[in-house]
Amino acid sequence: MAKTLFITGASSGIGAETAREAVKAGWNVGLFARSRDKLRDLADELGEAALPLPGDVTDESDLAGAVADCVSRFGGIDAAFANAGRGLETPGTEKADLDDIRGMIELNITGLLLTARLTLPELRKTKGTLVLTGSAAGRRHIAGSIYGATKWFVHGYAGNMAEEMREWGGRCAVVAPGMVDTPFFDDGAPGKLQVQDVAAAVMHIIEAP
C-alpha cells in the first residue's frame, strides 16, 4: 500500500517539487496551500496520487478539514512536511511594517505549530515522520533578521519534537537550505540551490529506514 505525505505550502517552489518527487517514488500526496488554481494544476499534473486541499495554514479549521480529507482519501498519513512560510516585504526591526511582521510570525510559527498539532495524531498511528522547513538563516546570526529569528524557532522546535516523537517511534527532522531558486528570492544569485535539491533531502528523510 502506498504511503502518504501531507505537504503545506504545496502550490509552488519546494513544496510542489517535493510533491513531484514523492509521487515519482510511489507516494500519495495531500497538497495544502492557499492557491486553489495552482493546487488544481499541480494535482492535474500528478494524477490520482495527488489530492488538492486549498486552505489557510494559520486557520485551524481549514487545516483540520484538510487532514481529515487526506486521511479519508488515502487511509492515513505517513509523513507531514510543514513547509509553508514567507519573509518580509521590507526587512528590519525599524523599517518593517508591523502588520507584515505579525503576518510572517503567524505563518512561519503558528502555521507550523498547527500543522504539527493536527498531523501528529495520524503520524502516531503510522510511527511517521514530521519534516519542517528551516533555513540557513536559522543557524547563524544575521543583522536585524526577524525572518531568521522565526527560523531559529523552527530549528529549536524540531529538536524538541524529535525528542517527543522518539518516545513512540516517530521522527522529526528539519531541512535548512540557504538561497533556493524559487519566487521567495527576487534576485538571482550564483550557487543557488535548486528546488530539486531540497525535495531530494526531504525524500531522503521520509524514506530513511
Predicted regions located by residue number:
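Conserved glycine-rich cofactor-binding loop
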Residues: 11-12
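Residue(s) in the substrate-gating loop at a strand-loop-helix junction
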Residues: 135
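Conserved glycine-rich Rossmann-like NAD(P)H-binding loop of the short-chain dehydrogenase/reductase
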Residues: 25-41
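Active-site helix of classical SDR
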Residues: 116, 150
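The beta1-alpha1 cofactor-binding region of Rossmann-like NAD(H)/NADP(H)-dependent oxidoreductases
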Residues: 54-65, 98
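Substrate-binding pocket helix/loop in short-chain dehydrogenase/reductase
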Residues: 91-93, 97-105
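C-terminal helical subdomain
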Residues: 167-170, 174-175, 189-209
